[in-house]
Amino acid sequence: MYSMRVVIEETDVTIRADSKESVSSAAKAVKLHRSELDRYVAKDPAFVTAKVPVRTLEGAPEVAKLMSRAAEPFGVGPMAAVAGAIAELAARASEPTVIVDNGGDVQVRARRSVVVGLYVSDDHPLSGRIGFEIEGVLGVCTSSGKFGHSYSAGKADAVTVFAERASLADAAATAICNLTSGDDPEAAVQRALEFADDFTGDLIEAAVVIRGDFVGISGRPPKIVSLRGGRIKPARLEPTI
């Protein structure tokens, strides 16, 4: 596969695709949508700080509208979907097979089977040891109360969500992770799963919630595979092709 890394301030995207043209198309889309979002939030600063759903202003760019729509059903602010939305739009601009990894929030469009590995935290026994086998179109996004740059009110080691669109997976992961606070890890995982159950089979396909020794699954995630060849580097979710 061909690959390229695009870094624009907080946006750190790795693109992998079967052709140079697909990589180039995705990279151009990342730059375009990041630039349009920067210009938009300069006019609508409340869009960045909102912790609840907000509507976009008239004339908002596609990326801002996508973020707003994705966040609304989960009751979170639009920035909860920013990484997934940019990954989704970049992958949409390319021909399969393409994998766009925006800081661990991943959009896959694959004509063949690919594996996305799970990163939890450096000291967690599952981290880098398992992956998910994916074919077709799928977004895979993770939120954590332990690592990463994104805001989370939860204490989960990782909440990984699978949805056809990465924008939805990203917003859902944030919302589910926010419910994993409290001193009782088992109760926190159960509470998060009950929330996820309201969306699985509809807006999302599955969610995996990990806090300490407690792991719970809502819905039907992709096939889980063992990564025996070594650990992946810390990037939340990392394409292992």
Swiss-Prot record:
Assigned protein family: Belongs to the UPF0280 family.
Organism domain of life: Archaea
NCBIfam families: PRK04334.1-1
Residues passing through the membrane, by range: none
Organism listed in the record: Methanopyrus kandleri (strain AV19 / DSM 6324 / JCM 9639 / NBRC 100938)
Name of the protein described by the UniProt record: UPF0280 protein MK0206
